[in-house]
Amino acid sequence: MRSLNLARYALSACAAAAIVSGCGGSQPLAGPAMMPQQARSAPHTVPEWKARGQARSACPEVVGKPTCFALIKTKGASPACIGSSCGWAPLDLQTRYKLPIAKGAGQIVAIVDAGDNPSAASDLSTYRTQFGLGTAVFSKYNQEGQQGNYPTYTGWSVEIDLDIEMVSATCPKCTIFLVEANSSDNADLEAAEAEAVTLGAHIVSNSWGCYGSISCVGQSYFDTPGVAYLAATGDAGLNQMGAPAALASVAAIGGTQLAKNGSQYSETIWSGAGGGCVTGIAKPKWQHDNVCSARAAADGSAEAGCSPGVSEFDSFDGGWFGVCGTSAASPIVAGAFGLAGNATKQNGGRTFWLRKHRKHLYDVCSSQCLFSTYSYGGGWGSPNGLGAL
C-alpha cells in the first residue's frame, strides 16, 4: 500500500475564508480529517495557485454559501493569446482522455450556474469555430425553464463560458442546456438544478459549491434516479470542500495537472484540488476503503491545473484567456459521461470505485496515494477512455 505524502499535499489546503483574509499559519494534515464545519476557525496554508500568483478567483471567495470555482490565470498567459496559446485546447483533452468524439449525439448535458451571461451562445460559437468543433446544439434557460426573462448578471460569466466550452471540448455532439439561476442563493440554485432535470437532462454538471458547508443545498435536489450529478470539489485543497460535491449522490470531481512531453501526456494531482474525508456525510455502500469512515472525495478527476490551464473565450470579460481550477474538471468529465451514454445507470461516484474500472482510469496520485491508486484530490484518477463511465 502506498502512503500519502501528507506534508507535501498539505500545501494545498486553505479554506476560502483564509483565502480572503490571509492565512495566519499552517497545519499539517496528519491525523483525523477536519470536519468541514470547522473550516472557518482552523489555521491553513495558502493554496499554491494563490501563493504563486498563478490565478485569481472569478467569483467572490466566500465560506458557507454557493460560489463559483473558476480561476482566471494571472501568470504565464499572454494578454493577447488566442485559442490554444491560452491553454489546453479540445484536442489535448480528447487525446489524453481517449475520447471517441463522434459519439454523444442526443445526450443532454446540463450546466447549472448563477446569473446571466448574455453572450454565452455567441461565445460558445466562437470557441467551437476556433477549434473546429462544428455548430453547437445549445439552449439557454432561466430557472423556470423559460428561454427568455433571463436573470441579471451576477459575476459568473467566466464560469458559465468555461462550463459550456469544456463540455463542447469533450463531447462536441452533446446537447448542452445552460440553466441560469436567478442568483447564487441556495434556493435559486436548487430551483435551477431541479429545472435541468425537468427539461430532460440526464447529466448535470456543477462547477460551484459551498466551502466549509455540507448542508448549504438540499441533498434531494441532487438525487434523482437516472440522473448523473457531477460537482467540482473546489480549489482550496484538502478538507475544505462542501456541498454539492460532498453529497454521496454526486460524483465529486477533483483536479489534476496535465502535462505534455513531446506527444506524450501525463497527469499528477493538482495541488489546489479539493477533497477529503467528509465528516457528516455517511459513507456510501459503494465506497470500500478503510481510511475514511465517512464519505471520501473526490471520486474521479480531470485537468484543473494552472500550468497552462485551459483556453476559454468570453467576450463579456475581454475575449480569449486561460482559466483553471476544478471548475474545468467537472464539465470535462460530464462531457465524457455524455460520450459513454450510461448516465441513467449512474449512482453518485460509484462507477469510479468499481475495481473492474481501475484499468480505465489513469493513476494520477503516484507517491501521494492514500491506498491503491486513490487520493483525495484526484479520486481514482482521470478517464482513460470510456470504460469507467
Protein language model features and the residues they cover:
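Bacterial N-terminal signal peptides that target proteins for export
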Residues: M1-L11
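Walker A/P-loop NTP-binding active-site region of P-loop NTPases
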Residues: A336
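Phosphate/diphosphate-binding glycine-rich loops and adjacent basic-rich segments that engage nucleotide
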Residues: S263-G274
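Substrate-binding/charge-relay-adjacent region of secreted/lumenal peptidase catalytic domains
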Residues: G31-G255, G276-C324, S330, G341-R350, ...
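Bacterial signal peptide processing site
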Residues: G24-Q27
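Short acidic, Gly/Pro-enriched loop/turn segments at secondary-structure junctions
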Residues: N186, A259-Y265
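C-terminal motif of bacterial Sec signal peptides marking the signal peptidase cleavage site
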Residues: I19-G22
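Short acidic, Pro/Gly- and aromatic-enriched capping/linker segments at domain boundaries
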Residues: S366-Y374
